[in-house]
Amino acid sequence: MLKLHPSIDNGFPPASPGFAGGTLKCKCASNPVTVRIGSQTAHNHACGCTKCWKPEGAIFAQIAVVGRDNVNVTSGAEKLQVVDPSATIQRYACRDCGTHMYGRIENTKHPFYGLDFVHTELSDETGWSPPEFAAFVSSIIESGVNPESMPEIRARLTELGLQPYDCLSPPLMDAIATHIAKQTGALPA
């Protein structure tokens, strides 16, 4: 069987009704960074971009969003560093193990400002929103995946119920376009 990501390869459970979040933990055996997520996540997806953190051997990352006011570093804050200060999403990673703990957009004019990006697979709790789609699928080629494998990869994503896109899902692309249209005056604010 084609391996995409350990949290999606064998299917995934549905979200638990009333699930209110949990704690993410980096891969350090001692003194791990922990981040409390205070609510359910949304727009969970497999991501093929080369910026997102992936566990060892994974082709895709698994990433979801949550309101930034629901993200709280509870231990190890001194170990966090921004991976690429020039990136739109400031990805905070543990400097010891390299695990990305959360990503934050600081540009208040960005359509996704106020949402943080998190890897729910770093939590021991169950009940998180499941992945809904696969984004930036073609980008896995940039990380070394053979382009000839793409039809098989897209077929496997589809088999898992994850519609493959080479951008974000249509509702997220609509949200971006709506935000821009309101900023430019093409739509009322």
Curated annotation (Swiss-Prot):
Pathway note: One-carbon metabolism; formaldehyde degradation; formate from formaldehyde (glutathione route): step 1/3
Stretches assigned to the CENP-V/GFA domain: 19-166
- Residues recorded as binding Zn(2+) 2, renumbered to this chain, are C47, C49, C52
Cofactor dependence is on: Zn(2+)
Reaction catalyzed = S-(hydroxymethyl)glutathione = glutathione + formaldehyde
Task: List the Gene3D superfamilies.
Answer: glutathione-dependent formaldehyde- activating enzyme (gfa)
What does the record's cofactor remark say about binding?
A: Binds 2 Zn(2+) ions per subunit.
Q: Which UniProt keywords apply?
A: Lyase, Metal-binding, Plasmid, Zinc
Similarity comment: Belongs to the Gfa family.
What's this protein's function? Catalyzes the condensation of formaldehyde and glutathione to S-hydroxymethylglutathione.
What name goes with this protein? Glutathione-dependent formaldehyde-activating enzyme
Q: Which organism is it from?
A: Rhizobium meliloti (strain 1021)
Q: Which gene encodes it?
A: gfa
